[in-house]
Regions:
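Von Willebrand factor
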Residues: 2-59
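Short glycine-/polar-rich loops that comprise or flank the Walker A/P-loop
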Residues: 5-6, 141-143
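Exposed acidic/Ser/Thr-rich ligand/metal-binding surfaces
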Residues: 6, 86-136
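Phosphate/oxyanion-binding active-site loops and adjacent basic polyanion-contact surfaces
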Residues: 21-25, 78-87, 122, 126
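Arginine/glycine-rich "motif VI" loop of SF2 helicases in the C-terminal RecA-like domain
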Residues: 37-38, 135-141
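Short, charged loop segments at secondary-structure junctions
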Residues: 53-88
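Conserved small/polar residues in nucleotide/adenosyl-binding loops
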Residues: 147-150
Length: 150
């Protein structure tokens, strides 16, 4: 494991029910990025925006290179495919870690999920499958954390 390297995956709900919360979501993301830039060590940032589809806007970008999010980046629309977004992000990051040299796997991985609502549109993943994926990642890498913000 690579000491002093943290992988942070933001999964941000942009479904229609987030209408009126755009400024809070953007401000919260930007605040967390600015705080992370001041921390010791390195951080890689991935950001997934989701409604009924997921869009990756950062894929393992060094935190120092992440620009502030704007309302051009984040606008609400669609339904809430929460489980598809979480499952897809875990699958992607899990594969990156699986095929990386051990010395390149981050010491810590944190998934930060911001949503206001309940699942209503996922087609690829269900709650049981996502729970199993989370447990498998925790068993394999140990230092994987999930934070759900509402």
């Amino acid at each position: 494991m690579r000491k002093n390297l943290t992988e942070i995956v933001f999964i941000l709900d942009r479904s229609g029910s987030m209408s009126g919360l755009e400024a809070d979501t953007i401000g919260g993301f930007n605040s967390m990025i600015e705080k992370q830039k001041k921390e010791n060590g390195e951080a890689l940032i991935s950001t997934v925006l989701f409604d009924n589809v997921s869009e990756v806007i950062h894929d393992r970008v060094p935190v120092q290179k992440v620009e502030p999010m704007t309302d051009n980046d984040y606008s609400v629309r669609g339904c809430t495919a929460l489980l598809d977004a979480i499952g897809g992000a875990i699958h992607h990051i899990g594969n990156v870690h699986k095929y990386a040299r051990n010395e390149d796997v981050p010491e810590h991985t944190l998934f930060v999920i911001t949503t206001d609502g309940m699942e209503n549109a996922s087609r690829r993943y269900d709650s049981e499958k996502v729970k199993k994926m989370i447990e498998r990642q925790k068993e394999k890498y140990g230092s994987v954390s999930y934070t759900h913000l509402r």
